[in-house]
Amino acid sequence: MTSKYLFAAFVAACLGTISCSSDAEQTTEQTTQRARVRLVCNTAPAVTMNAPSSRATLAANGKALTDIYIFDYNKATGALLQLLHQTSTATDFAEPELMLDYGEHTIRVVATRSTTPSLLDATGTVWTSADNVLTTISGTIPAALTATKTSDTFGASADVSVGVGTSQAVTITLDRLVAQLVIDSKDTYPAECSTFDIALAEYRSISCADLSVICSENNHRLTEVSSLAGKAGQAMTYFVLVPAEGYTTDVTITTNSTAGTQYASITVPNVPFARNKVTTISGTFYNHQQGFSVAINDTWDAEGNTINI
């Protein structure tokens, strides 16, 4: 699709300042000493880790995370040395063993259940490697992690020392990188309802180098709601990547009919988003009257926002 190529070009522009190749390798006759280190990924209290007899699983609020990306960086030079993309089918999911060179490392981890996650290089080209295989980096390097649709996502970094007498196991606690947006409809969905269109500025990628969220663009989330016809009090939930400091954006909600006409198009200005918090926009979206409400208040965190419209 054309939008796919436009998004790749957009990401390339976002990543223009990131080098697309690794530092030149130096030839040495010395044999590199290595050690096997077990990495255990867990998360904040809202996230649980289970260990069935078959394999480990990592879940958030009862929903399993599907992909884990582990980046092994040389702490001194910042060079990416190795990468492991684990899918939920891996027998050691969230608990892999890594072969690491002696020395100082920075390990960065992203765990997600976003739809179709993929790595991109600095030009916006998809960067591929074998799933569930620890891959040595050479040539072009991955610069960003993106997805076709953002869902619950976590990340963290940890410095690791590898050598004689150092720990053979490292635990990394992951923190949420997203906010949740809830559209809480207070009216009854009409018989001819078709789609909900949510338009907002959102971040589309995560930088591999420092796990910051990057590439903000205007995006549409289109949800098919025809199955809700005749029902009342139905809410829809979305996830958005959020910078550490949070951000605000206008959110436009458009309700459409099967005839191709609009019931309403409502813009809520300056909607706040913060990591690990839920923003709720509550009101009537088909027979709109005054009294919208926006809020951030959720079991994820003690604080939140609510906006009534």
State where each predicted segment sits:
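Bacterial Sec-dependent N-terminal signal peptides
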Residues: 2-5, 15-47, 183, 276, ...
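Structural motif
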Residues: 25, 40-62, 184-192
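Short, surface-exposed loop/turn motifs at beta-strand boundaries within globular domains
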Residues: 32, 63, 102, 174-178
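Intrinsic-disorder/low-complexity, polar/charged segments enriched in Ser/Thr/Lys/Arg/Asp/Glu/Gln
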Residues: 34-36, 93-95, 167-169, 180, ...
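Tryptophan-paired
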Residues: 57-124, 190-277, 296-298, 302-309
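Residues within well-ordered beta-strands of beta-sheet-rich folds
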Residues: 108-110, 180-184
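Extracellular beta-sheet/turn segments enriched in Thr/Pro/Gly and aliphatic residues
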Residues: 132-177, 184-186, 266-309
